[in-house]
Amino acid sequence: MTDKEKRLQRQSRIRNFSIIAHIDHGKSTLADRILEKTAAITQREMKEQLLDSMDLERERGITIKLNSVQLKYQAKDGEEYIFHLIDTPGHVDFTYEVSRSLAACEGAILVVDAAQGIEAQTLANVYLALDNDLEILPVINKIDLPSAEPERVRQEVEDVIGLDASEAVLASAKAGIGIEEILEQIVEKVPAPSGDPEAPLQALIFDSLYDAYRGVVAYIRVVQGTVKAGQKIKMMATGKEFEVTEVGVFTPKAVPADELTVGDVGFLTAAIKNVGDTRVGDTITSAENPAPEALPGYRKLNPMVYCGLYPIDTAKYNDLREALEKLELNDSALQYEAETSQALGFGFRCGFLGMLHMEIIQERIEREFNIDLITTAPSVIYDVYMTDGEKIVVDNPSNMPDPQKIDRVEEPFVKATMMVPNDFVGAVMELCQGKRGQFIDMQYLDANRVSIVYEIPLAEIVYEFFDQLKSNTKGYASFDYELIGYKPSKLVKMDIMLNGEKIDALSFIVHRDYAYERGKVIVEKLKELIPRQQFEVPVQAAIGTKIVARSTIKAMRKNVLAKCYGGDISRKRKLLEKQKEGKRRMKQVGSVEVPQEAFMAVLKMDDSGPKS
């Protein structure tokens, strides 16, 4: 048998698939069971959420990064099949990670909770899978729960998504029920990868990480051709050339292999020192015999939310730059640029996909790189049209131009789809109205679940909307959003002044109708949070030159009369005058320390009055 025939025979037994599911529908547990069933790991190595290798993932019980693993499975037809399972995140902020992993597959297992049914993010991920022409295998999980209704959910999969669910596997990943059926369905229904092992090499980089000893490790899916150690490769986007030092697969541990050929999912090292040379979504080809064109990569994702990250210890500015460079390597949705603030010194303006993404990056910097951060209030990108016809893009409230020169301001709107139980429809609609939302559509999925669609300004969703939605529905709602474009709004910039000085990091953009209430609440909040000084400190909220709210932090007072026992009033008056004069001088030169909580207070407006 020739090399080519061997490769083609092996290729016909490869199955690449990923698991898509809403958070908590049992995706990581199902992955654990599949690993056990195919004996990829011993019982001794087994631990919950095995593929979620980041501590943060295990703590929060969510998958953030995609992971891949190669498994061997002895099917009932007597053949040994090679499975590549690519694990995907389920949260709306990590849709990009999902689209990356789906591009490396031919099939997807759709896990739906037998008690909860289809959720908003399940839908979003299914549409991504359909865009990539994947074979979708529905699995109804958690059938051992007392509240499970597998038949209702099966009907829901057919009605809401339009998939034929008559052969959907009823399973319980926790109890290990139905796992074998799932594996057999993968063998029967997921197509083998198509491609020619002899053609010029085309391999898609779907992730990468930096290893101190081996340089950059690229995770690849080979689409055409073959790659082995010693071969010269070329990155199609950057044109850089390297010599491959090692190729291999994950089982889940990294194991070297002789070669990777069509359909294989594995890793490649080539002494690549510079993180920027392996862009996720780039195509690797052979330097001697390059492919005529690159593979269609990924959509470039634009950040939706911006905020400033500043090191508390300014000496760590360069460490923060390095941390962001390393995180950006395998999180291409993260963007950053240097910025300075009068209040906080040197830092970076970073762009994220959403609030969870922002929190996770922040936590990863603090944990993995040991840098304590101050973060400023998140903001979205506004389009500002000037009276002279010029258009300015503003992602930082302190860059907002002079209101006299502004013709109009447009802000991004999203179409938010919420799936909620019937009883909470009123509460959810009230929440959306309070967030300047506009009602679009409402559909009853079944007797007790409703899908509600609103158009809401992104700035309203950015902070705590998801938490408020969950608390208004006792945790039952699910939520997904997509950007629909920009619309004009009556927006103004509000400055916060301490002791007559503007604090640039506390500025924010607010809807004019809510400006007064919001200013009042923030001023009161800052009054509580900023420690008292030796002198009186006025806290003011201003729009342009107009002060809309004011409060005063009272001065701390030392009792200068303590050492006067009885005696002459003029002596006491002299001491009091001297104290008063000292306070006056101090007020002129004194600066006010602003604690981190004060920056977050600008955001947390949920416990008082209307919100902007």
Curated annotation (Swiss-Prot):
By its UniProt entry, which Pfam families does this protein fall under?
EFG_C, GTP_EFTU, GTP_EFTU_D2, LepA_C
Q: Which terms does the UniProt entry file under GO BP?
A: positive regulation of translation
Q: Which UniProt keywords apply?
A: Cell membrane, GTP-binding, Hydrolase, Membrane, Nucleotide-binding, Protein biosynthesis
- What's the main place this protein lives? membrane
State any single GO MF term: GTPase activity
Q: Does the keyword Hydrolase apply?
A: yes
Which compartments is it annotated to reside in? Cell membrane
Which cysteine pairs are joined by S-S bonds? none
Annotated membrane topology is: Peripheral membrane protein
Source species, domain of life: Bacteria
Q: Where does GTP bind?
A: 24-29, 141-144
Catalytic activity entry? GTP + H2O = GDP + phosphate + H(+)
All copies of domain tr-type G, residue ranges? 12-194
Enzyme Commission (EC) number: 3.6.5.n1
* Coiled-coil intervals, chain numbering: none
Q: Name one GO cellular component term.
A: plasma membrane
Provide the top EC class.
hydrolase
Q: Which family does it belong to?
A: Belongs to the TRAFAC class translation factor GTPase superfamily. Classic translation factor GTPase family. LepA subfamily.
What role does it play?
Answer: Required for accurate and efficient protein synthesis under certain stress conditions. May act as a fidelity factor of the translation reaction, by catalyzing a one-codon backward translocation of tRNAs on improperly translocated ribosomes. Back-translocation proceeds from a post-translocation (POST) complex to a pre-translocation (PRE) complex, thus giving elongation factor G a second chance to translocate the tRNAs correctly. Binds to ribosomes in a GTP-dependent manner.
HAMAP family, from UniProt?
Answer: LepA
**What protein name applies here?**
Elongation factor 4
Organism expressing this protein natively: Bacillus licheniformis (strain ATCC 14580 / DSM 13 / JCM 2505 / CCUG 7422 / NBRC 12200 / NCIMB 9375 / NCTC 10341 / NRRL NRS-1264 / Gibson 46)
- Taxonomy-wise, where does this protein's organism fall, top ranks first? Bacteria, Bacillati, Bacillota, Bacilli, Bacillales
